[in-house]
């Protein structure tokens, strides 16, 4: 393999990694996946192995906009009305479970694309939805 091919392979693999959602692991405690969208993030928690009643999500930890939002210990939640920019999203489950902090880039809102996404979702064409946090 030539140097140019090796470089092209490495660069293309890097671009795939950048396009992937952020996944935070806590070994056998479970995992949290955070996907940023337009003024929202989607958080999915899976694999919690201990009996926990709920998990907590903070989509803006370390800022004046910090919150603590409850969610089921295995499931998905979409948190709306976030300011565009970098957010550190914290996920933790009391009594054991996922503990993670993930940096994501929240995009600015776009009313026309949001309306289009709602129409696609209502028509059963969720594969055409443009906001990753709504897929």
Predicted regions and their residues:
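Secretory targeting and sorting signals
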Residues: 1-26
